[in-house]
């Protein structure tokens, strides 16, 4: 659940984007080009490839039959700005250490000696690098998720520590839950060559599932801040 401080930040973003006071009343249907142009206008000018973002955002609205009202667009853009500043795969400082600390914590809970953990992480992974090297080089959740996918799938200790479940739980520009995406993938409009987890790390997938989580259900209230509070 969002904290009061974060809700205030999201409210401020709505004001800065010129979205304050917008209501979600159903407008007359608009041409795709008109909606995309509005998305580009509402996005911060510094964001690279705003046209590409607009295309993926519009496609997510259209595929889910969600009305692209100005309020709905503003709500989506506010969350993407707050969560990732419109980065498809945002970097996380100190991520490798965080991951190693979690591995050590789980190993301690399972009474696995540290030297065995270090030995398991010294095994070469499918990329040719050791798991320890890949952990140290990880800069984003996508990097870390790939490490854990391989570690859990190929090293027995990985399965012992994580039970087959990748501990990276969120992804994408809106930081949507991967579990949510996997549970709502039935109508996903794009071809999936790998897994839904991998799709959430793409711009199109991250925005599709993020928009589904934020707007893909009916509510009785009108203010977008209440949707922000529901988005977790």
Predicted segments with their positions:
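Cell-wall glycan-active module
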Residues: 1-5, 14-232
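N-terminal basic, Ser/Thr-rich segments that initiate or prime the first beta/alpha elements at protein or domain
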Residues: 8
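Flanking scaffold residues of small Cys/His-coordinated metal-binding clusters
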Residues: 11
